[in-house]
């Protein structure tokens, strides 16, 4: 009887170790980003610098138009770019302000108040297919202008949401650049 208990205990311990090993070796399926990317691309703007305040005209308190952006150091093997603008400080969690994909990888400038030509625009968290400027309920929020370089052109229809975009980007990100600005009411 003692040997049977030891064998059963050993089987449970081995099973537990196997489950633990499988769990911790499994890649994080919730992330659109691969484990390692180069982070060589740079995103800048003529109207605000990294960690500075975003001018009022680019917010819901102003003209609510997108700021001009410049993208440099895009890798040669890129097939398309994705632009995501979001606010991680929103009370309900990350709030998406703009989704644009299938941007031509030769694009170096995104003009003020315009989406890149021939790109697809997704539905932001305001429920619109356009840029929605900073509009925090209170306090200072951070706004990230993220540009992803992909090894493919995405087969995703205009009007898709952030979750759909994140899912289809998985495994295709070669590089990323971002600019962070702040805004407060």
Model-derived features: where do they sit?
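N-terminus-centered regions that define maturation/targeting leaders and the start
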Residues: 2-185
